[in-house]
């Protein structure tokens, strides 16, 4: 695995707090209130500055190659705010942290639901070194089916204020069966509002029942198959199965074969992931609070992890255990110790 001097980008989960209840997010269960062991916390400006010392800042600051055109390379970001559980707009020191980073010459990318704070707050983030990706999954009548508790009109208002202040915005669209027919309308609206780009986000989580905070069935996401019932099972039955399926040894992954080719995002992108409690991981896929959170990918990581809190020990020491993750790829299967997340997210299919 990589050493600190190899790192050129850091993904940061600034907070585990969120104003939304996306049904496929690990911070709840299908929209219902459920915490499987993550801390409710965030990084302050002082703590952030402690982690991002001068050495790390020098490494993630983009320098144009010698002889290149002197304009900014817009696709390189030294810091990406894109947490597993929380949303940037819920962090108390978010604006101050971004201002500090751009003052250090760092390119910043923020991915957010954009549904909290005022328009004036968002306008403060406008800067040539900052791009904000607003998650807008359709129009006003469909957006909230996935981004629960997020008001589409408010997101548009916040994005418009940010753009009018000179901000660079990206429309991030998750396609579902219920909103695919609106994609072109969304593209047209994005262009008319001044978004500089439109991006389709696909992560495979696009189907299942959705529940209220109190566990009552709300609606389905995704079209039902011909043999499927529109009546969902009780939430508790789904939750019990979710909690125990990994423990039953029934994990089946396409890449769980002998000698899999793992294309590690940590190594390819030369990046780290810093969670909201200051702990450090090779990537976001391994950063679901493995010491405390019940998650399919955490059991093996929990065994490998060593002291990794950058608020307690030097950042370089926090990377020392990464080599053990790579060594664990040599296990014969997930059941025998190969990290689940590495196989699920970084397995490369053989070329046919």
What does each model-found stretch correspond to?
Residues 17-29, 282, 340-349:
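Local cysteine-cluster metal-coordination motifs and their immediate loop/turn environment
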Residues 13, 28, 32-49, 58-65, ...:
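Radical SAM enzyme [4Fe-4S]-AdoMet core and its adjacent flexible, acidic
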């Amino acid at each position: 695995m990589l050493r600190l001097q190899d790192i050129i980008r850091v993904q940061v989960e600034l907070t585990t707090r969120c104003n939304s209840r996306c049904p496929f997010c690990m911070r709840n269960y299908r929209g219902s209130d459920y915490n499987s062991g993550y801390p409710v916390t965030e990084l302050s400006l002082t703590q952030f500055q402690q982690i991002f010392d001068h050495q790390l800042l020098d490494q993630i600051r983009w320098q144009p190659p010698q002889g290149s055109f002197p304009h900014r390379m817009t696709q390189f970001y030294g810091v990406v705010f894109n947490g597993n559980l929380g949303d940037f707009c819920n962090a108390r020191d978010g604006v101050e942290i971004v201002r500090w980073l751009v003052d250090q010459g760092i390119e910043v990318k923020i991915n957010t639901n954009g549904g909290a704070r005022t328009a004036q707050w968002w306008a403060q983030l406008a800067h040539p070194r900052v791009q904000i990706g607003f998650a807008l999954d359709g129009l006003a009548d469909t957006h909230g089916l996935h981004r629960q508790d997020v008001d589409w009109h408010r997101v548009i208002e916040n994005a418009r204020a940010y753009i009018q202040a000179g901000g660079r915005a990206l429309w991030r669209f998750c396609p579902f069966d219920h909103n695919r027919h609106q994609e072109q309308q969304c593209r047209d609206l994005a262009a008319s509002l001044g978004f500089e780009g439109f991006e389709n986000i696909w992560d495979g989580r696009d189907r299942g029942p959705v529940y209220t905070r109190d566990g009552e069935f709300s609606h389905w996401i995704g079209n039902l198959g011909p043999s499927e019932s529109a009546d969902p099972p009780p939430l508790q039955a789904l939750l019990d199965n979710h909690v125990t399926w990994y423990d039953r040894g029934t994990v089946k992954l396409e890449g769980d074969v002998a000698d899999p080719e793992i294309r590690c995002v940590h190594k390819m992108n030369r990046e780290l992931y810093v969670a909201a409690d200051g702990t450090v991981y090779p990537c976001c896929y391994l950063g679901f609070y493995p010491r405390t959170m019940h998650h399919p990918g955490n059991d093996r990581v929990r065994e490998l992890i060593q002291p990794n809190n950058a608020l307690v020990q030097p950042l370089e020491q926090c990377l020392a255990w990464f080599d053990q993750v790579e060594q664990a790829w040599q296990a014969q299967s997930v059941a025998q110790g190969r990290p689940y997340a590495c196989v699920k997210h970084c397995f490369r299919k053989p070329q046919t």
